[in-house]
Amino acid sequence: MALISSKPLGTLIRVADSDGGEGAANYEIADINNFVSGGVVLVRKNIYSNSAFGSNTNYPNGTLDNLIKTTIYNKMPQQLRDKMMDVTFKLSGSGDITRKMFALTYTMAGFGNNSGVAEGKALQLYTSNASRVKTLNGSAASWWLSARGSSDYAWLVGADGSASSYGNYPSSTRGVVPAFAIPQSVMLEDSANTDGSYNIKYTEKISCTVNMGSIEEQPKAALPIISCNGNLTLKICNNANDANPAWETAANETVHNFANTTKTAAQWAIGLKIDITRTAGENLFLNEPVVLAMK
């Protein structure tokens, strides 16, 4: 596995964003720990669909904004939505907005300030017209930015990758290119897909229940010692031989005093319920647990 931030700009990341999560599309790594501190910005490699900009040239809560922040966002896998970062940026004529998914601004697309307003930061990938060219159904096509050009027109990226606003009325239909940011600690699968894209490696988990063995006398306290990495959640009981053990929340390497004083089985037994989840890029492991029983 590899950190997403270890991949070069332009690397393709496979994301399901259509057909209720069944369809697949590629997003390109456009920015690493630059516009979004600690984040990687992913931009759809090609155009999602065509849409109007809105009823006017202000992006917030218009047709394009609602399509991206609601419709497309809701088609993303829940595990990916959980990782998306809140991104705040300024828009000329609208001020600051915060979104988990958004259309690129004039500045993000590499065109500089929009009417004197820095609309976020230039994304590292977009340094030429060629880098901004996107296709719809295999043909290069224009796509909307979230930027106001004037009271009449909105900015877009033309089929050749250049910026254009004149004649682009908000009621016109142009391409939709969503973007979002996820933490740079997100992991990718080792093997690439046939088209060279990589799949995101979602949180893994180790879960197990361990009976540490029977004892004659009632254990009143115990010291669990768990050697592992990742985020550990631990439960313990002193009647693990019972059909329904009394599980109690415990802390690793901390003496636990049992609240339970009863059992239905012939003998007492200390049991552990161990759950470990990945926190970043670590390879999960769990060594054999140890428990010191106290009578």
Task: Report the location of each language-model feature.
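Collagenous Gly-X-Y triple-helix signature in extracellular proteins
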Residues: 1-211, 226-227, 236-238, 273-278, ...
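Beta-strand-rich ligand- or partner-binding modules
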Residues: 199-295
